[in-house]
């Protein structure tokens, strides 16, 4: 393999699973990278980073699977919402079935495989 030793995921098509959970029921705004953008400047465009406005709660996690060629570069999910109550957001990114990052936050949270 020619993948860099520091890269946790070799290049090629990888199954990426984003999961967002909360401790209370609410409508969340969830942004996620759905496809590899050609460059960082394009990453925020809706065709690469759509927004899902959806109900999330303790018994209703939000999960989305997509395929990314370079999840180390582009794996990203963020969620926010719940201004009246602290929903204790939690996000997780799994690559090829293995959780590679998870974070917890109050009224918002972000998971990425590199600094954004």
Where in this protein do the model-derived segments appear?
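Short beta-strand/loop motifs in extracellular/secreted proteins, especially
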Residues: 26-29, 87-89
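Mature extracytoplasmic domains of secretory-pathway proteins
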Residues: 32-83
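Short beta-strand-to-coil "C-cap" segments at the C-terminal boundary of structured domains/repeats
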Residues: 34, 113-116
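N-terminal low-complexity, Pro/Thr-rich disordered segments
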Residues: 1-13, 38-49
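Short, well-ordered strand-loop elements centered on a beta-strand within folded domains, enriched
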Residues: 28-31, 101-102
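Noncatalytic modules at the cell exterior or secretory-pathway interfaces
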Residues: 10-23, 71-79
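Aromatic side chains
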Residues: 18, 31-32
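Extracytosolic low-complexity repeat regions of secreted or lipid-anchored proteins
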Residues: 61-114
């Amino acid at each position: 393999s020619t993948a860099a030793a520091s890269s946790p995921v070799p290049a090629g098509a990888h199954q990426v699973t984003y999961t967002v959970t909360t401790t209370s029921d609410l409508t969340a705004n969830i942004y996620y990278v759905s496809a590899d953008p050609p460059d960082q400047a394009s990453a925020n465009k809706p065709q690469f980073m759509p927004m899902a406005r959806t109900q999330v709660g303790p018994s209703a996690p939000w999960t989305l699977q997509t395929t990314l060629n370079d999840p180390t570069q582009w794996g990203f999910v963020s969620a926010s919402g719940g201004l009246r109550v602290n929903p204790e957001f939690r996000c997780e990114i799994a690559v090829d079935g293995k959780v590679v990052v998870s974070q917890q936050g109050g009224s918002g949270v972000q998971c990425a495989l590199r600094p954004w």
